[in-house]
UniProtKB/Swiss-Prot annotation:
GO terms for biological process: translation. The keyword Ribosomal protein applies. GO terms for cellular component: ribonucleoprotein complex; ribosome. InterPro entries: Ribosomal_bL9 (IPR000244), Ribosomal_bL9/RNase_H1_N (IPR009027), Ribosomal_bL9_bac/chp (IPR020594), Ribosomal_bL9_C (IPR020069), Ribosomal_bL9_C_sf (IPR036791), Ribosomal_bL9_N (IPR020070), Ribosomal_bL9_N_sf (IPR036935). The gene is rplI. Disulfide bonds: none annotated. This is Large ribosomal subunit protein bL9.
């Protein structure tokens, strides 16, 4: 199929800035750009109308961006805790998706929807994970997601302590290092 020409109404990551004339596949235009209000078809009438409204659209975009920057500044360093069941190795029974993260962030006081969460893949292990929340196409807020089995475990993870098998392995490695040093110095360790 032939590519579709569109005029972007806002910045779209990896595609272009507001006002750019872009060529995209029909499905991308039909399913993402057009219904989301991110672009309009590049007909002669739409091009003329866009040029007439360009200043107004840029002013609206600037206002939305400034509001998003204020919100990002107010909640910078945001960290949310998500409690999930997990096995001994730290693998979750299930996963944490963008929907779960959006609910946790909304409960902490910042209203977001799951489409604003940029998550490369679902979280399937306990621990801290950094995700991006897109408040505006030009404003991205980093959020730390702390996935743990309990609130106490989440607090330990937030302090940087290892949990689960990782904690046991760290303790065993520390003990092995202590024994190795003691052997080198020929000191007896009593258990």
């Amino acid at each position: 199929m032939a590519a579709v020409e569109l005029i972007l109404l806002q910045r779209v990551e990896k595609l272009g800035q507001m006002g750019d004339l872009v060529r995209v596949k029909p499905g991308y235009a039909r399913n993402f750009l057009l219904p989301g209000g991110r672009a309009i078809r590049a007909t002669k009438a739409n091009t003329e109308r866009f040029e007439q409204q360009r200043a107004q659209l840029e002013a609206q975009n600037l206002k939305r961006r400034e509001e998003a920057e204020r919100i990002a500044e107010r909640v910078s360093g945001l960290s949310v805790v998500i409690i999930r069941q997990a096995g001994e190795s730290g693998g979750l029974y299930g996963s944490v998706s963008s929907r779960d993260i959006a609910v946790a962030i909304t409960e902490s006081g910042l209203s977001v929807n799951r489409q604003q969460i940029q998550l490369d893949q679902p979280i399937k292990m306990l621990g801290l994970t950094d995700v991006r929340v897109v408040l505006h196409p030009e404003v991205v807020l980093p959020v730390t997601v702390n996935v743990a089995r309990s609130v106490e475990e989440a607090e330990r993870q937030a302090r940087g302590e290892a949990v689960g098998l990782a904690a046991e392995e760290a303790a065993a490695a520390a003990e092995a290092a202590l024994i190795e040093v003691a052997d080198e110095e020929e000191v007896e360790i009593s258990a």
